Each structure stands twice: as structure tokens, then as C-alpha cells.
Amino acid sequence: MIYTLSGPQHIDTTIQLPPSKSISNRALIIQALANGNLVPRHLSDCDDTKVIVEALKTRSETIDIKAAGTAMRFLAAYLSVREGEHVLTGTDRMKQRPIGVLVDALRYLGADIQYEGEVGYPPLRIKGHPLAGGFIEIPGNVSSQFISALLLIGPMLEKGLELKLTDEIISRPYIDLTLCMMRDFGAIADWTDVDTIRVAAKAYSARDYYIESDWTASSYWYEIMALADDSEAVVRLEGLMDGSKQGDSVVKYIFSLLGIKTSFKTTAPGVPNIVTLHRHKCLLPRLEYDFTGSPDLAQTVVVTCVNMNIKFHFKGLSTLRIKETDRIEALKTELRKLGFVLQSVGDDELLWDGERCQPSDEPIKTYEDHRMALAFAPVALKRQGLQINNPEVVSKSYPDYWKDLQTAGFTL
């Protein structure tokens, strides 16, 4: 399938953003560990969350999580402490995404996990049973989902969990989100040092829980505002929380540098806000930023900057190599189609010094990566008739994206 997109001349729209995928997935695992029958309210209906919902209900031995990386990591830990034997598998791409660090850590804690194929990669055969827990060290520069997976089962371990993170800690806001949610459900879990987290052996308590909207999803609307030629453009986003624990709420700061002003309208404490985005003049010639804490925003900001003719040097991108695709190479390849030549430095850095090439009319390839489609679609404001391959991939995190774009006046 190919969508051909064109952007509107004027934007004045109100969008109900999807529930947070990150919060939904954590809440489901915690509620299951609490043996609660309560389903979190305002739960995400994206593919990744649906996979976890089905996995927690299934009686089948084989659990296919498809392309859901979060589900693979969280369920590997969850199934390790639940009685029963399961095979956890996924797509061909999922079988290429390393999971050895998490498996080694779970085995160290006493888990019974075997590789069904290549060592260090899914599928996994897991025989669940009670684990002793205790002290463990793992690198801090691995996917934060490995760390969150271990933390989530910490209260279920006989000795609790003391987790020391060596090396630089990446995506720390996601770790903090996990700890905050664990405490919301009665766990005793916190940092005891700059590199050490302690989780007590105290069971979760099931409770009613509301899922706020997704700050990562808001980033595509910030991009739309930044790329719109309409100086009077207005976008209102419903469901976001001011002071959110979502690490990607930093998007409001990043885009303030790119000329987008964020205003909150709060009706009552603890109630989701209406966030209004306005444009002001951006005079920034170059942007430098470290995405270590918010790598999922990188594609959005990269695509925005080149289309605003803002040079950049971005760091903290190492985890982009092992996402749904190699996002660094995918960005370089697809932006070249639009006439921009990017350079990568090692596995961690991406820069654009203003170099251009002859653009082509080739459709944008999405590489089975939802964030490629999500980040490139707003370019239709600058390039009418932009074509995007396999647009259905957005269902992984933002199922109503195309409908919401049409609400805002895009044609497809």
C-alpha cells in the first residue's frame, strides 16, 4: 500500500492523542503481577499493547509478540516468575534484535530460559518459577526496556532486587517512569545511589489506574506546526499531563528552540490538559542535542530540522541501530530521496551541515518502522504529493494517525 499525502494551506485543529504506549504496557504487567482484575482505564489500542493484552490472557504455549520489542522484553521477565512453560517468539526482524543482556540477567537471578535458535536472540523457551532475586550488575548503556523488565518483577523476587548499572545510563527517563509507576501500585522502589536501584520484596497492590496521553505521539504535531507555512496555525492536543513522568515530554523544550510555543490549559489538578501549540519566529541556524534520554524523538527532530534548513549535530543515538530497523541508516537513505545528505559518526551521532543532492520522486520507505511513517508524513506540508510506503505500520503506536491528519486537513 502507498499513501500520497498533501498538506493543508491552513491548520486549526483539535486532536485527541492516543493513550501512552509506555504507560499502558507497564500498567498491564504490573496489574498482572498484582493478580488484579482491574483493567487500566484509557488503555492504548496500538499493536504493541494489544500483543501484551493477548499474551497475558493466552493459554497457548507459544506466544507470538510479532514486532513488539517492549512486549518481548517485559514478557520475558514476567513469564520467568509465572508458573508454566512458554515459547516467546516474534517476526524475523524481532529474531535479529539482541536480548542476551536481559536473558543473562534473568538467568543470574535464577530464571530457566533457553534459546530456541541463535544464542542471544529470540525465540526464547521460558519455564517460569519463583526467583530468589538479590544483587545484580548490568550495563546502563543497554536498552532501558531491559532494565525496566527487571525492575517490574523486582517486588515478586524473594529477596527483592538490587540493581547496579555500570557504564553510562541511557534513556534514564524511561527507568524513572517505571519506578514511579511501581510506587503507584504500592512497590518500594527507588534509586539508592546515582547508579543503583533497590526494589523491596513487597507485593504490588491492584488499583484503578488512568493512562494519560502519549507525549511521543505529540511530537508529530509539533513537527507539523514547525513545518507549516501558515503563521496563524494552531494545534490543540487533548489528554497530555503537565509535569508528566514520560521522558518524551521534553519535546516541548526541543521544539521551543524550533519556534513552537506550548501553552497548557488545566481544568483541575491531576486532570489531563488541553495543550495548545502556536508558532513564533525561529532564528536558530544550528541545533545540537543529546537524545540519550529520549531516542524516540530523534527521527521527528531530524526530519523537522532538514526541512526547516536548520543544520544539526545530534548525539545519544546508539539505540537507534537496534530498533525496528537501523533508524540512522534509514534516515540517511530516505532523506537523500528528499535532497538532504546526512552523515553519521560511529553508532552514536548524526549530523547535517547543509549538504544537498538532487531529490527523487521515489516513495518514502518505512522499513516496517512506525516512527519512519509518523516522522515523514508531515513533510507533505513542504512537498505536496509525498508518497509513503506501507503506511499501515503506524498501528504499532498511533493507529488513528492518518485519520487525525485528515481531521487537520491533510489529503491522502
Please annotate each region the language model reported:
Residues 1-412:
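Short, structured segments at the rim of ligand-binding sites
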